[in-house]
Regions:
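FAD-site-proximal beta/loop scaffold in flavoenzymes
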Residues: 37, 42, 48-64, 159-193
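N-terminal Rossmann-fold NAD(P) dinucleotide-binding loop
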Residues: 79-80
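A Rossmann-like FAD-binding core segment of flavoenzymes
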Residues: 5-19, 24-27, 32, 88-186
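Flexible, charged surface loops at secondary-structure boundaries
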Residues: 64-67, 152-153
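Glycine-rich Rossmann-fold phosphate-binding loop(s) that bind the pyrophosphate
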Residues: 74-76
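Single conserved hydrophobic/aromatic residue that forms the stacking wall/gate
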Residues: 1-3
Length: 193
């Protein structure tokens, strides 16, 4: 099995990219458009219930939770916007933010707090996603100030803790930021000629 980093050769005037199937492409330039993936919580039960109660796109999956109770993990702009959007669909939306304060813009925080079916908890660490083998049934949250753990019964969880760059095949070949984004200049060029 070849590693993804073995599929790319960017040195010299001719660049090459090969597919997992062995097909090879050669060019004088390569456009890298690998995008990003949703960051995951990496807690017990999350992977097991992705698509069965753990979701990442409130616009895509929100309608499946009409009239139900959901959690949004993340108190940045994406998380609070998701909570506001889901509040129009769901019976109840509970937001859990790891930090002591929300990071979302103040106007979004005010809107979310004004909604009667949105509840917000800060200093909240997600410990575990629980389910019945078919779907999510609850989430375990640890209060980071008191150490107390509590199970919240609910129907769905929307993870909104940011995106991770899909740049793994290029990380040893191009200069990247500490979070994995490929560094470019004002003309979208990498540091390689």
């Amino acid at each position: 099995t070849r590693r993804s980093s073995d599929l790319v050769k960017l040195q010299g005037t001719e660049k090459s990219v090969s597919t997992v199937g062995g097909e090879m492409f050669h060019a004088s330039a390569v456009i890298i458009a690998t995008g990003a993936s949703w960051r995951k919580l990496n807690v017990e039960g999350e992977a097991e219930y992705i698509g069965r109660g753990v979701a990442f796109c409130p616009h895509c999956d929100g309608p499946f939770y009409q009239g139900k109770h959901v959690a949004v993990i993340g108190g940045g702009n994406s998380g609070i916007e998701a909570a506001i959007d889901l509040a129009g669909i769901c019976r109840k939306v509970t937001v859990f933010e790891f930090a002591d304060t929300l990071k979302a813009d103040q106007v979004l925080q005010e809107k979310a707090r004004s909604l009667p079916n949105v509840e917000i908890f800060t200093s909240s660490q997600t410990i575990k996603v629980d389910g019945n083998g078919e779907k999510v049934t609850s989430i375990r949250i640890k209060d980071r100030l008191t150490g107390e753990e509590r199970d919240f019964p609910l129907d769905g969880i929307f993870v909104q803790i940011g995106l991770a760059a899909n740049s793994a095949p290029f990380r040893n070949k191009l200069e990247t930021t500490p979070t994995g984004e490929i560094k470019i200049d004002a003309f979208c060029r990498t540091t390689l000629p």
